[in-house]
Amino acid sequence: MTKRVLISVSDKAGIVEFAQELKKLGWEIISTGGTKVALDNAGVDTIAIDDVTGFPEMMDGRVKTLHPNIHGGLLARRDLDSHLEAAKDNKIELIDLVVVNLYPFKETILKPDVTYADAVENIDIGGPSMLRSAAKNHASVTVVVDPADYAVVLDELAANGETSYETRQRLAAKVFRHTAAYDALIAKYFTAQVGESKPEKLTLTYDLKQPMRYGENPQQDADFYQKALPTDYSIASAKQLNGKELSFNNIRDADAAIRIIRDFKDSPTVVALKHMNPCGIGQADDIETAWEYAYESDPVSIFGGIVVLNREVDAATAEKMHGVFLEIIIAPSYTDEALAILINKKKNLRILALPFNAQEASEVEAEYTGVVGGLLVQNQDVVKESPADWQVVTKRQPTETEATALEFAWKAIKYVKSNGIIVTNDHMTLGVGPGQTNRVASVRLAIDQAKDRLDGAVLASDAFFPFADNVEEIAKAGIKAIIQPGGSVRDQESIEAADKYGLTMVFTGVRHFRH
């Protein structure tokens, strides 16, 4: 009995060659629309879909394969006489292979000028229906949705006259993943169109970007997936120019670092990060000086860290950086000389380029945190703040220099693990106290790291001070200016302590917990 294949593809890469090989193996080819035209023009004999259905393609191609003669040929079980008799009685010929890929819905909605009507017209109906019918009946039918699978199917057909059950099952699984992802994108698009912020069902779709050797630890399996609708300003979209593949921990740290530097876009800034916490942030009039400040913030912790710069890396900056062991450098661009310096000196240094012109688009993305049996979803902590909205709650007002330093410190504290404390001046971090289970311990840790650089320093806290003992510790160290959200039932005690020691303290009214 002659084998039949139905081919209907929007991505025509390799389809002519695939069809030609099937013809050599004696297969009969049914085809639709533009696919049939492409095959006919290449000299591949095909049967029109309307010759199979008895109905013409209609309604601008919306209806062409939704017919019992197609789906009966796909769904009939070859091991059930009743199915085969029903097919024979209704003059339905069996279809043994389906090659379908779908209307380019994703590519359509990514176009900057896409209209709602364009998006709707690129929702495929017949294609997913054929794919699902064939995949359901994979015991008898081979289904191909990915051109990358053409070769393995041809090899098995040439060698054995049919594909193996294992191959059919694997291809069916790929189809169901593919159609689920396709529908998820459509659901996401329509959900956004109607402004639904809390849908009762949430389906996320990601594409495998990189299999990983292991996860956070060697005993943990891991892979890296990228959003199906990519975000330009993200570690997943960065272009790697040198070095080994990024590890699981590299990716998490790099993501944290590029989030930080979004808040410092107005001036040349360098962020150094280790284990998801900033260990140095430097800001200056030029990127070379900003690097020096970031390095001097903590010359010990930066060893083996990740550095992100928000300006092009020049040769002078590269010369200074290459003397420090770093895991990753990320910048918008590099001069040819700078890149040569970094690569020649550090063959394994991971160097990435990430354009910073899409930062604001990245801020609207939701954050997903997995818990056992569930998923937490929240907006990113990107609230727009202005010093004009802050309140000086002490008798003493900040000096101009202190005000600048407090603003710098407040940007930085958002990214320190809670309970988080940071000590800075107006252009660099001096001490970081992350992740302690009581706030006064974080205060002591940050102050101890800043040590003899406390003259003129300020301190920021990611949340309110529950007791005045924090202010006592700060005053004892000689720090004269504090910024914190406020909001404790004991705020007045902290204010009185600050006044007692002649400190200035600013309340922002916004908490920045980070877990």
UniProtKB/Swiss-Prot annotation:
<comment type="similarity">
    <text>Belongs to the PurH family.</text>
</comment>
<dbReference type="InterPro" id="IPR024051">
    <property type="entry name" value="AICAR_Tfase_dup_dom_sf"/>
</dbReference>
<keyword id="KW-0658">Purine biosynthesis</keyword>
<protein>
    <recommendedName>
        <fullName>Bifunctional purine biosynthesis protein PurH</fullName>
        <ecNumber>2.1.2.3</ecNumber>
        <ecNumber>3.5.4.10</ecNumber>
    </recommendedName>
</protein>
<comment type="pathway">
    <text>Purine metabolism; IMP biosynthesis via de novo pathway; IMP from 5-formamido-1-(5-phospho-D-ribosyl)imidazole-4-carboxamide: step 1/1.</text>
</comment>
<dbReference type="InterPro" id="IPR036914">
    <property type="entry name" value="MGS-like_dom_sf"/>
</dbReference>
<dbReference type="InterPro" id="IPR016193">
    <property type="entry name" value="Cytidine_deaminase-like"/>
</dbReference>
<dbReference type="GO" id="GO:0004643">
    <property type="term" value="F:phosphoribosylaminoimidazolecarboxamide formyltransferase activity"/>
</dbReference>
<comment type="pathway">
    <text>Purine metabolism; IMP biosynthesis via de novo pathway; 5-formamido-1-(5-phospho-D-ribosyl)imidazole-4-carboxamide from 5-amino-1-(5-phospho-D-ribosyl)imidazole-4-carboxamide (10-formyl THF route): step 1/1.</text>
</comment>
<dbReference type="GO" id="GO:0006189">
    <property type="term" value="P:'de novo' IMP biosynthetic process"/>
</dbReference>
<dbReference type="InterPro" id="IPR011607">
    <property type="entry name" value="MGS-like_dom"/>
</dbReference>
<feature type="domain" description="MGS-like">
    <location>
        <begin position="1"/>
        <end position="145"/>
    </location>
</feature>
<dbReference type="Pfam" id="PF02142">
    <property type="entry name" value="MGS"/>
</dbReference>
<keyword id="KW-0511">Multifunctional enzyme</keyword>
<dbReference type="InterPro" id="IPR002695">
    <property type="entry name" value="PurH-like"/>
</dbReference>
<keyword id="KW-0808">Transferase</keyword>
<dbReference type="GO" id="GO:0005829">
    <property type="term" value="C:cytosol"/>
</dbReference>
<keyword id="KW-0378">Hydrolase</keyword>
<dbReference type="GO" id="GO:0003937">
    <property type="term" value="F:IMP cyclohydrolase activity"/>
</dbReference>
<dbReference type="Pfam" id="PF01808">
    <property type="entry name" value="AICARFT_IMPCHas"/>
</dbReference>
